[in-house]
Swiss-Prot record:
Domain of life: Eukaryota
Induction (UniProt): Up-regulated in CD11b(+)Ly6G(+) and CD11b(+)Ly6C(+) neutrophils upon S.typhimurium bacterial infection. Up-regulated in CD11b(+)Ly6C(intermediate)Ly6G(high)MHCI(-) neutrophils and CD11b(+)Ly6C(high)Ly6G(low)MHCII(+) inflammatory monocytes in response to TLR4 ligand lipopolysaccharide (LPS) stimulation.
Organism annotation: Mus musculus
Glycosylated residue positions: N74, N185
Name of the protein in its database record: T-cell-interacting, activating receptor on myeloid cells protein 1
Signal peptide: 1-16
Function (record text): May act as receptor. Negatively regulates TCR-mediated CD4(+) T cell proliferation and activation, possibly by binding an unknown ligand on the T cell surface. Enhances Toll-like receptor-mediated production of pro-inflammatory cytokines by macrophages and neutrophils.
Keywords carried by this UniProt record: Adaptive immunity, Cell membrane, Disulfide bond, Glycoprotein, Immunity, Immunoglobulin domain, Innate immunity, Membrane, Receptor, Repeat, Signal, Transmembrane, Transmembrane helix
Length: 288
């Protein structure tokens, strides 16, 4: 058993050594952000740098300048987190991370791919609409239009956002007032709530607040029309929050149904128990 463990350990160390390219630099890490790379001012974000090999420490850089260095926090020594609180406009920009490998000693890696962080809320909100309304079937094309505020001059970039995605779905550069985003050959995975923002293409990357949400539901065109209509909600409609009264009413009806069913079951079970007890009392004693 011990010899097997030693063999596995030797294999791991050998693999770690062979992960280093011939030029002496370890493979580049990956950099991600949670909950998103597009966040409102005064919010929080965590950037995570992950290396493919055990590391001694990690460095986070913004626009090429080092901001912070931390040691890995997990047992595999392959991950480090960088926390930002109370985000401001000047926190926006391009970030990369690097790590120093343990084998060979203190060998710096190549930088990760750049991660663009956008802090919103410094320009007027855009308008957001669909070019058409009605049923959206799988395989069709959906075009969404984002329009910046008329008071904002100069070229900007537009970003299409989707609830639940940590990065923009699409980005577009534009010298005009509007930008169109096309979703080609949509599937059920494209269903969801979308919004858009626009921002300056250069530092300090001033960005608007997000537009109102627009909901897209994609219907499978292989389903019968009556089944599809009963299974999916209306398509391409702006979302409207449920009122507390409507939600409370639904919960009350459901609770009454549950209580009624439970009471009926208890009455039936109680009847069986009473009948069994009564029969036991009337039956003669059996000899031993």
């Amino acid at each position: 058993m011990i010899s097997r463990l030693l063999s596995l350990l030797c294999l791991r160390l050998c693999v770690g050594q062979t992960d280093i390219p011939e030029n002496g630099s370890p493979p580049k890490p990956s950099l991600s952000a949670w909950p998103s790379t597009v966040l409102p001012t005064k919010s929080h974000v965590t950037m995570q740098c992950k290396s493919p090999t055990p590391s001694k420490y990690f460095i986070l850089k913004k626009e090429g300048f080092a901001l912070n260095s931390v040691k890995p926090y997990n047992l595999t020594e392959e991950t480090a987190d960088f926390h930002f609180t109370d985000l401001r406009q000047n926190d926006g920009g391009h970030y990369t991370c690097e790590y120093y490998s343990k084998w060979p000693h203190d060998t710096p890696s190549h930088p990760s791919n750049a991660l663009f962080l956008l802090v919103t809320g410094y320009l007027p909100q855009p308008s957001f609409q669909a070019h058409h309304r009605g049923t959206v079937t799988a395989g069709s094309k959906v075009t969404l239009q984002c329009q910046k505020a008329g008071s904002v001059l100069g070229p900007v970039k537009f970003a299409l956002l989707k609830v639940g995605h940590s990065t923009p779905v699409q980005t577009r550069s534009s010298t005009g007032m509007v930008s169109d985003f096309s979703l080609q050959n949509v599937t059920a995975r494209d269903s969801g709530e979308y919004s858009c923002v626009y921002y300056q293409a250069k530092a300090p990357y001033r960005a608007s607040g997000p537009s109102n949400l627009l909901e897209i539901s994609v219907i499978d065109n292989h389903l019968p029309q009556d089944l599809a209509a009963s299974t999916f909600p209306p398509q391409l409609t702006a979302t409207s929050p449920k009122t507390p009264g409507t939600m409370t009413e639904g919960y009350t009806v459901d609770n009454l149904i549950r209580v009624g069913v439970a009471a009926a079951i208890l009455l039936i079970v109680g009847g069986f128990l009473v009948e069994a007890w009564h029969s036991e009392r009337l039956s003669p004693n059996k000899p031993w």
